[in-house]
């Protein structure tokens, strides 16, 4: 029966979550304070590291005794080079296996690097936050929440009670995929491979969901998307099984679909089995207990009973080794149990190793260590695959940070030829890797060599280790939990280069490089997973761990580190990345920095490996990007790498001979040659031994190597060829012989070097042509070509390897047979022989004839088209054919031929074809896209890249002519006639489709510039292309008018956030923009930032809005300051011009505005506004400024009234004084206005508007300056001022209470009566407010606190004390003045008022107490 899965998608939440949150920006500060081991190791290719004599010439090389890979003398150049490639491959494949440097013993060898060092083995490249929607679900969880990672598909998951949510953590705004059909709390989730033959092929994984009652299996379809991520779909399988009494916390799966379970209640291992359909004696899904089969599985364990003698034991993890069919379990008692998966449903426990056994093994190997005692626990296991090590099986991590490497053996392994595939029977500790030293004692000598100190067995650097993960070939991640809320992540990797260059006579050591990955504060690591394919440089232990061999062939390893805040992506740095970054640091360093770095690499990794890395970097490798993502290396770094390759590559020399070898055979080629061979070998190592084709069912032919991989390899080889060609004049062995006389030995050595380098060049040429041939082969119908071959040729094609195709005569001969078959097939299908031959010449280059033949054919087709002007179908076919032919030879078309063709296309109204041809020619003339790099670099003068741009410009100018002609030919023509597009509309649409669909960025920039020159800005706004944005963004940096155009572009597409960003950046820029215009820009930016934009999170909007608001506030202050200074009569006119030039432009810092202008000019109101904008926190300074502002305002008001009185009296004003038009306000009124202005602009900020201290100041001003009833003012005007500003009644009363109680001047003696009057006035207004609204209503309506809406007993007590104060004043007055009747009456009236208010307050308090007792 056909395997089938029910195709019903799981219902769930598909929510568009907002973008991840970022840290809130800190408020800016106010003002800046005014400043008053032995010999060098040999390399595998024969060139040993040696000291560098100078930066101009490499030093002498030490003969290692290893023969440099050389070829036989009687072979042709390509075959010689191929032999060198094979020898180099063999050397790379002989890299030591893990067992050889993890032999019995212990080590603490690390070379620690800081996280920001160019030598750091890992670095964080991206961080993806957990979506806000997930946090909302997590916060809503009631019973149990859990996070996890499916790194192999790029997804994370969260279980909240009985719901499960998955999301693509690489997506900035991921969609949540939910499973909410579980009825019980989810305890564990795992993604495992499906069992073959059970589901349809679209099911790529099985999602196992364990709850407290059952275990559910869901089908998962993970399909790749164009962006490189995975699209996930869940399907119900209707497969579930009852969980039983055992807990399920750990779920693992094997590659053949078996699913094992374990939990934290016991150490039992369960297995879930499932099948396509039910059978007689088995259901579709079931569960087996492999630890206690049968009835024992349901009998309670004695350990759980009160009389149980043993401590309760449970699992801490399950781990699968598919390469050995082993399952490991780890318990809380650090016991490791090994199970062997013998058959499809059988699981047998073969080894149980407890902690005591490990301690005993350690005692046999090394002295005691405080890191490995009976209190030490094992926290994690990591299986070591059989492809990586034949002896070592497992790595265990202790909570003290020690790595224990354990081997497992069977009895058969002790016999000669014993079967090693049998289940192991014993396990033994082989090697211990201790943590790095807490204080590194490793030192580096002057020549860069490292001297190791003794074994350190006491370091607590990794204590306590909470989690640990090991990935092949030894990438180690250790989560160190020294602080309760902060994890530290230690990562290390084998130092492959040092292991590789260890001398044969020396014992191999487990050299490692380590570093600490810095995580944000508060991060707790939950899980770490490998997101790229597992590492494997070989299929067997020997050569498996050679990272250097595959650094140009495989993507660097990437790892997802899941924390409670998100997923951190950590990437492995290859040696070429480290070298490139180290050279990048030398760009701006001293002259001898390059020598120091190269010396360091040579001493550590050998000269050949170093020079190979330099060559790779010079060819564009080492950009620290993933393989295939394009070049990212800067030119300065490439130049330094080129210098290192040329200057430190060494020289060929004659070795000492015993006389049995010929002179030429005793030549030791230079490290430069060996490095070139090494780099070339590593570029082609994937395909070198691979077969070209694979034959499937029905003679279906496919490529064994993906064509994209072939293209990448070809591009890298071509870069290498171009590099050698461009620098051949300076590379010894490629350059012409020097004029100085050589000795015979030097001459022979240089000839041999030249021959070897020439052979490698010929091989590179053959590789490039061979790949082109294969690509062309698969562009054709290769199955038809295969069918046309005879049986012998068919078999030869099936057996053909790339090595044979590139370098061997039989492969070349077979290629000629295939070429003939291709031509015959095309002839049979009616194709022209010349067309086929041209394709072969273009793709392979070996059968090249002048491109003029194709050009003539294209022109012939164009001429025939002009004769068919009235036969539209034939005309279109001939025009299309001519365009196709022209595009084939676009790179060789002369400007004259191109111009003629375009003119003919225009005459035939083939506008789209004319534009397409010009675009193709422009691209072919500059295939390296150097014109774009020249434009991106700002079009520097006297640059060789300008020539490429000029050649492109010729094509673009022709496109302008075509578009001009198109518009003039169809000017005034209607777009539609009878509802159908006219010929004019069709031609215009075709032409502009070609224009807008072009991927030529340089063309788009040129086109938009032409549009602007012609005033067609509306066309730019109507184009939906990323190139428009890039173009306008560049112009916006230098032109305010174009920046406005960019804002219009954004707003017309509802991209308000980007528009706000542009406007904010413009306001902050140094462009010639007035301050008023900057205020307008910031006002618009604030408005645009307030509008919701799709894809922009609320927090991003708030951040931008906050920034624009702050800048707008500063700009308003600067504008006020500018207007005040320009109108200030104290400032000379020439100084005003300077001020206007400085302030009427870029927004200045608050420091400049305060120190240079506002403070010096005594603009105290502006000083207070600056304090507010800067979040200034000095209460003394702020209060002093208020005092100065009040005194200044009082003086100005009195002075204006004095001038008014002079004018009214007909007198003359002093010179320079402007006569007032209307009567100026009284001083207290003017002071009130100033206070109101500051209050409104600072929104009663408690720092700038401190009521507790400001209200007494204003009250004291009123008393000291007679601003009371004596001038007709309301005696209580200060209190009314603050209450009208919205200051709470309670706060005003409390401040007045403090004034009354402290009795500080001027509130002493009889003036305390005025304070009582203010208190009575404030309480009276408060009582009225409470009575008007009602206490609870007032609290609900105004949002005030309880003390504001509901009076406390303290108010009644205050009124009582106020009455006592009045009594005292009355008594004092009677004694001093004999009891004047008017004063006594005034006090008596005030006392009656106070007593009445006290009764009102008591009544309110009584009502409130009654309500409280009622509800109580």
Swiss-Prot record:
Pfam families for this protein: Nucleoporin_C (PF03177), Nucleoporin_N (PF08801)
Keywords: Membrane, mRNA transport, Nuclear pore complex, Nucleus, Protein transport, Translocation, Transport
Protein's cellular compartments: Nucleus, Nuclear pore complex; Nucleus membrane
Membrane topology, from the record: Peripheral membrane protein
Residue span of region Disordered: 1-26, 50-69
Biological process (GO), any one: mRNA transport
One cellular component (GO) term of this entry: nuclear pore inner ring
Main location: nucleus
A single MF term (Gene Ontology): structural constituent of nuclear pore
InterPro entries: Nucleoporin_Nup133/Nup155_C (IPR007187), Nucleoporin_Nup133/Nup155_N (IPR014908), Nucleoporin_Nup155 (IPR004870), Nucleoporin_Nup155_C_1 (IPR042533), Nucleoporin_Nup155_C_2 (IPR042537), Nucleoporin_Nup155_C_3 (IPR042538)
Similarity comment text for this entry: Belongs to the non-repetitive/WGA-negative nucleoporin family.
Assembly and interaction partners: Component of the nuclear pore complex (NPC). NPC constitutes the exclusive means of nucleocytoplasmic transport. NPCs allow the passive diffusion of ions and small molecules and the active, nuclear transport receptor-mediated bidirectional transport of macromolecules such as proteins, RNAs, ribonucleoparticles (RNPs), and ribosomal subunits across the nuclear envelope. Due to its 8-fold rotational symmetry, all subunits are present with 8 copies or multiples thereof. Part of a tetrameric NUP192-NUP170-NIC96-NUP53 or NUP188-NUP170-NIC96-NUP53 module.
Chain's role: Functions as a component of the nuclear pore complex (NPC). NPC components, collectively referred to as nucleoporins (NUPs), can play the role of both NPC structural components and of docking or interaction partners for transiently associated nuclear transport factors. NUP170 probably plays an important role in NPC assembly and organization.
PANTHER family: NUCLEAR PORE COMPLEX PROTEIN NUP155
Protein name: Nucleoporin NUP170
Encoding gene (name): NUP170
């Amino acid at each position: 029966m056909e395997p089938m899965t029910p195709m019903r998608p799981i219902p769930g939440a598909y929510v568009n979550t907002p973008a991840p949150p970022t840290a809130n920006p800190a408020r800016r500060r106010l003002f800046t304070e005014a400043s008053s081991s032995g010999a060098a190791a040999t390399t595998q290719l024969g060139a040993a590291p040696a000291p560098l004599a100078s930066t101009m010439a490499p030093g002498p090389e030490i003969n290692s005794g290893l023969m440099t890979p050389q070829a036989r003398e009687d072979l042709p150049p390509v075959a010689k080079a191929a032999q060198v490639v094979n020898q180099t491959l063999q050397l790379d494949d002989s890299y030591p296996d893990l067992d050889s440097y993890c032999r019995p013993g212990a080590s603490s060898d690390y070379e620690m690097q800081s996280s920001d060092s160019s030598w750091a083995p890992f670095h964080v490249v991206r961080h993806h936050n957990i979506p806000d929607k997930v946090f909302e679900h997590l916060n809503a969880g009631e019973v149990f929440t859990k996070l996890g990672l499916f790194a192999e598909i790029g997804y994370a998951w969260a279980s909240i009670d009985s719901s499960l949510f998955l999301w693509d953590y690489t997506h900035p705004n991921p969609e949540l995929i939910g499973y909410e059909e579980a009825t019980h709390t989810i305890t564990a989730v795992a993604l495992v491979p499906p069992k073959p033959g059970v589901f349809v092929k679209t099911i790529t994984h099985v999602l196992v969901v364990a709850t407290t009652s059952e275990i559910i299996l869901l089908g998962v379809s993970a399909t790749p998307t164009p962006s490189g991520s995975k699209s996930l779909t869940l399907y119900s399988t209707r497969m579930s099984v009852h969980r039983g009494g055992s807990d399920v916390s750990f779920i693992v799966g094997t590659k053949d679909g078996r699913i094992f379970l374990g939990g934290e209640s016991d150490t039992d291992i369960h297995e879930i089995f499932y099948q396509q359909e039910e059978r007689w004696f088995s259901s579709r899904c079931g569960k087996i207990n492999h630890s206690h089969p049968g009835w024992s599985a349901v009998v309670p364990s004695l350990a759980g009973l009160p009389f149980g003698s043993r401590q309760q034991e449970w699992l801490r993890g399950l781990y699968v080794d598919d390469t050995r069919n082993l399952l490991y379990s780890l318990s809380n008692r650090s016991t490791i149990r090994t199970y062997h998966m013998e058959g499809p449903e059988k699981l047998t426990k073969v080894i149980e190793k407890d902690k005591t056994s490990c301690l005993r093994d350690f005692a046999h190997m090394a002295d005691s260590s405080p890191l490995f005692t009976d209190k030490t626990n094992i926290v994690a296991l990591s299986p070591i695959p059989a492809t990586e090590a034949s002896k070592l099986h497992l790595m265990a991590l202790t909570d003290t940070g020690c790595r224990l490497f354990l081997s497992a053996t069977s009895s058969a392994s002790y016999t000669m030829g014993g079967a090693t595939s049998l289940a192991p029977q014993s396990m033994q500790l082989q090697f211990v890797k201790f943590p790095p030293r807490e204080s590194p004692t490793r030192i580096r000598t002057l020549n860069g060599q490292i001297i190791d100190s003794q074994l350190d067995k006491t370091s607590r650097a990794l204590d306590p280790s909470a989690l640990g993960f090991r990935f092949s070939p030894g990438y180690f991640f250790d989560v160190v939990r020294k602080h309760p809320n902060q994890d530290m992540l230690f990562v290390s990797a084998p130092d492959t280069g040092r292991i590789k260059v260890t001398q044969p006579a020396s014992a191999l050591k487990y050299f490692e490089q380590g570093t600490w990955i810095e995580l944000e504060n508060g991060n707790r690591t939950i899980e770490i997973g490998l997101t790229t394919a597992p590492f494997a440089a070989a299929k067997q232990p020997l050569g498996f761990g050679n990272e250097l061999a595959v650094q140009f062939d495989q993507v660097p390893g990437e790892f997802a580190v899941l924390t409670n805040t998100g997923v951190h992506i950590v990437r492995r740095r290859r040696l070429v990345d480290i070298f490139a970054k180290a050279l990048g640091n030398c760009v701006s360093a001293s002259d001898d920095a390059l020598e120091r770095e190269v010396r360091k690499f040579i001493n550590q990794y050998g000269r050949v490996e170093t020079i190979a890395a330099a060559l790779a970097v010079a060819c564009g490798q080492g950009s620290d990007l993933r393989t295939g993502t394009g070049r990212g290396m800067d030119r300065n770094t490439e130049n330094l790498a080129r210098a290192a390759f040329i200057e430190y590559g060494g020289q060929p020399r004659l070795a000492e001979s015993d006389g049995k070898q010929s002179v030429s055979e005793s030549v030791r080629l230079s490290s430069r040659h060996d490095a070139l061979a090494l780099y070339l070998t590593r570029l082609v190592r994937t395909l070198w031994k691979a077969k070209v084709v694979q034959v499937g069912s029905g003679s279906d032919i496919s490529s064994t190597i993906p064509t994209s991989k072939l293209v990448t390899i070809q591009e890298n080889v071509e870069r290498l060829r171009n590099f050698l060609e461009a620098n051949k004049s300076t590379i010894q062995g490629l350059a012409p012989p020097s004029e100085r006389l050589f000795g015979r030995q030097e001459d022979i050595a240089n000839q041999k070097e030249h021959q070897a380098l020439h052979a490698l060049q010929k091989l590179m040429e053959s590789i490039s042509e061979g790949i082109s041939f294969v690509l062309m082969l698969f562009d054709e119908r290769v199955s038809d070509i295969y069918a046309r071959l005879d049986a012998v040729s068919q078999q030869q094609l099936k057996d053909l390897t790339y090595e044979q195709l590139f370098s061997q005569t039989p492969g070349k001969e077979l290629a000629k047979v295939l070429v003939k078959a291709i031509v015959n097939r095309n002839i049979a299908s009616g194709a022209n022989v010349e067309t086929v031959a041209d394709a072969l010449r273009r793709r392979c280059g070996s059968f090249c004839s002048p491109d003029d033949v194709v050009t003539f054919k294209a022109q012939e087709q164009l001429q025939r088209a002009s004769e068919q002007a009235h036969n539209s179908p034939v005309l279109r076919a001939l025009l299309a054919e001519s365009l196709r032919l022209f595009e084939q030879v676009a790179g060789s078309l002369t400007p004259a031929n191109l111009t003629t063709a375009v003119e003919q296309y225009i005459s035939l109204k083939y506008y789209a074809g004319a534009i397409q041809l010009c675009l193709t020619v422009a691209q072919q003339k500059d295939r390296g896209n150097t014109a774009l790099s020249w434009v991106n670099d700002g079009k520097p003068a006297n640059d060789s890249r300008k020539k490429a741009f000029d050649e492109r410009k010729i094509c673009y100018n022709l496109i302008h002519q075509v578009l001009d002609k198109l518009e003039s030919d169809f000017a005034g023509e209607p777009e539609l006639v009878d509802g159908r597009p006219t010929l004019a509309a069709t031609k215009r649409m075709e032409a502009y489709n070609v224009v807008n669909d072009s991927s030529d960025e340089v063309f788009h920039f040129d086109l938009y510039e032409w549009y602007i020159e012609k005033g067609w800005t509306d066309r730019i706004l109507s184009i939906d292309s990323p190139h428009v944005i890039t173009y306008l963004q560049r112009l916006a940096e230098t032109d305010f008018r174009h920046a406005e155009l960019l804002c219009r572009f954004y707003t017309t597409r509802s991209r308000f956030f980007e528009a706000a960003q542009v406007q904010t950046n413009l306001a902050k820029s140094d462009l010639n923009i007035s301050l008023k215009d900057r205020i307008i820009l910031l006002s618009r930016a604030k408005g645009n930032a307030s509008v919701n934009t799709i894809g922009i999170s609320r927090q991003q909007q708030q951040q931008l809005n906050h920034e624009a608001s702050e800048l707008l506030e500063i700009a308003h202050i600067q504008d006020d300051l500018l207007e005040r200074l320009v109108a200030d009569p104290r400032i000379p006119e020439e100084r005003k011009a300077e001020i206007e030039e400085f302030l009427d432009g870029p927004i200045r810092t608050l420091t400049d505005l305060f120190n240079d202008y506002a403070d010096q000019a005594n603009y105290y109101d502006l000083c207070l506004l600056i304090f507010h904008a800067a979040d200034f926190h000095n209460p003394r300074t702020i209060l002093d400024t208020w005092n100065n502002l009040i005194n200044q305002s009082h003086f100005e008001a009195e002075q204006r009234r004095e001038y008014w009185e002079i004018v009214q009296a007909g007198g003359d004003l002093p010179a320079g004084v402007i006569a007032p038009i209307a009567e100026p306000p009284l001083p207290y009124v003017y002071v009130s206005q100033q206070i109101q202005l500051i209050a409104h602009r600072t929104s009663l900020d408690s720092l700038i508007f401190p009521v507790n201290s400001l209200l007494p100041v204003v009250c004291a001003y009123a008393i000291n300056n007679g601003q009371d009833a004596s001038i007709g003012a309301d005696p209580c005007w200060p209190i009314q001022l603050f209450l009208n500003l919205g200051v709470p009644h309670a706060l005003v009363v409390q401040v007045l209470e403090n004034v009354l109680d402290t009795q500080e001047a001027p509130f002493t003696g009889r003036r305390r009566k005025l304070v009582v009057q203010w208190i009575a006035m404030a309480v009276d207004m408060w009582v009225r407010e409470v009575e008007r609204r009602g206490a609870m209503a007032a609290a609900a309506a105004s949002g005030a606190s309880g003390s504001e809406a509901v009076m406390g007993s303290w108010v009644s007590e205050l009124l009582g004390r106020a009455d006592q104060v009045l009594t005292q004043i009355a008594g004092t007055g009677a004694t001093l003045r004999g009891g004047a009747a008017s004063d006594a009456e005034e006090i008596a009236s005030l006392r009656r008022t106070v007593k009445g208010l006290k009764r009102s307050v008591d009544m309110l308090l009584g009502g409130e107490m009654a309500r409280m007792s009622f509800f109580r």
